[in-house]
């Protein structure tokens, strides 16, 4: 068992300090009592903070080697929150091969509110650099794209972004922190549709944002609290439970897809296979 596997099973806040329970209980309360007037409390209203959700968020941050994590009601809610830190007139460079829901959010919502978008092939660093404008604030991309599995180097893009004082935002849904931890390669913000591999059982709709520093954490938390697209305590518990088997599931899924690709390569009816996990394939 590796250090990462141990993190999957033993979350930072797994034990409940109130009861001694070895797993975090599901706290359904919407409001929390003050011990006395004016006393500082960790939670007062569940939209702003919930013990079950917080335990999950701390686990997400640990898996991605981040400073703070935030759990949302869907992957799109997470993407919305990450992009909402920008303001009217800001310019973003985005990958030209991104999830369709992200494309729709960018071009039919955020552009309408004044965010400027330029799509480029993020595998081409020269194309990224040529797209940088005085008002450019960030580069957003998927390291392995949905659905054609085109591969972009997080390390190279992040290095270019740092040269120009830009944020690097990575949608790590397809790889998960088991296969890639973008923050360790220079990224600033990582996004997940936790509905997919993190949950793993097709029974939770969830999203996650993990950030590298406190300044970004404060900005994302403000958006999470203001917009209210939080993950429920029940779904937070289900997602935390699914995360425990992430490495086991992905190991089996990787082995299965290699067998499938080997089989498809022998079929004359199949003209092209997109799978970067086998040498020689795009």
Positions of predicted regions on the chain:
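Short clusters of hydrophobic/aromatic residues that line enzyme substrate/ligand-binding pockets
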Residues: 9, 45, 197-198
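Short, hydrophobic/aliphatic alpha-helical segments
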Residues: 4-8, 58-61, 186-188
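N-terminal amphipathic/basic leader segments beginning at the initiator methionine
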Residues: 1-38
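Conserved N-terminal alpha-helix of the aminotransferase class I/II PLP-enzyme fold
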Residues: 31-80, 85, 101-110
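A generic secondary-structure signal marking the coil-to-beta-strand transition
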Residues: 5, 22-26, 41, 68, ...
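Short, basic and Ser/Thr-rich N-terminal targeting/leader segments
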Residues: 21-22, 65, 113
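Conserved PLP-enzyme active-site core in the AAT-like
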Residues: 70-269, 274, 279-280
